[in-house]
Amino acid sequence: VGYDAIVDLAKNTAQYSSSITEDEHGPRHMGVSSDPVQDDVEEILSHAHPIVNALFTADPPVHTRHRKLISKALSPRSVRALEPQIREVCHALIDSFVGNPQVDLLNEFAIPLPVTVIADILGVDRADMWTFKHWGDLMISGNIDVLSHEKRRDVARAVVDLHNYFVPRIEQRRITPTDDLLSEMVNAQIDGEPALTTEELLPIIDQILLAGHETTTNLIGNGMLVLLNDPALMTRLKQQPDDIPAMVEEVLRWDAPIQCTYRRATAEGSINGVPIAKGSMVIPAWAGANWDPKAFENPEIFDIDRPTGKTHMGFGYGPHFCAGAELARLEARIAFETLLERLTDFSLDREASDLTRIASFAAQGYTRVIMNFSART
């Protein structure tokens, strides 16, 4: 299936629903296999707060309403205002390892950067960011992977823990709003009534946490691997930092952090002549579209000077295009700017690194990236 077919699929939300459950209840994070959920896992999930399909797992018009409510906080103008804060976080992270001869790029920089930023945007304690990371990793896996029984238990515990963390904070923001996205969502109104119920807020918070860290972490990691393997491009970006945004866009096309998502066929149909039964799971492969030679000439070549033409699908396509795309772009740009500004003599420690891809069907990143460097003087 090529670029054009995936465009048609992504735009046709009536035929291909983003809700992988047929009822109104929200995602259970139990993986994408059809195996029944075991009783002990169901018992754990029984302690979670009820949720409904929201934002990413909702279809228009519900999706449209939810997206409108968060779009102001994630608009290009609002995101640009975060630049000093993001730059400060980047410099603080570099300060923590700059005296060493090497760095674990993911654990010491690419993971804490977006998790810290998301914590600040939501208005929750930075000290809890590694807990968010733990919950997020499990719940992302529950959204996009096939899970073992034990992994389902772990994911179920994460769902319950996340709900237990945020439900009292939602109630607190209803009484005492503060200047953050959580308060903005909790207290949003339509015709004088609360715009979002707790059942809607919880999955939206889930998605902001999940998408807000995983995509950016892998975008930074995947991009740095490109530079470590291409010293000429690394040198060019040091000399011409204005080219960094083009490099980020090409990483999103060439090695997209999210390779695909899922849709459920609501009726019988066909894609490129292949029959699709009602209820079937359909996978829009964004990575396949990004490497379609009819859309991108010589797609296997990493080229930041690629002529403008087709839009890459590194953030998806259509109504469910990633709401946090501008934030991820900004975080990645500032991350590369500060790394190249503060450090030099980069090299990859291949023996210490683990360049196997993370164990995920849909997410694309590296397991461990150990990078040698020198501090700029």
Language-model features, listed with the residues they occupy:
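Cytochrome P450
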Residues: 1-377
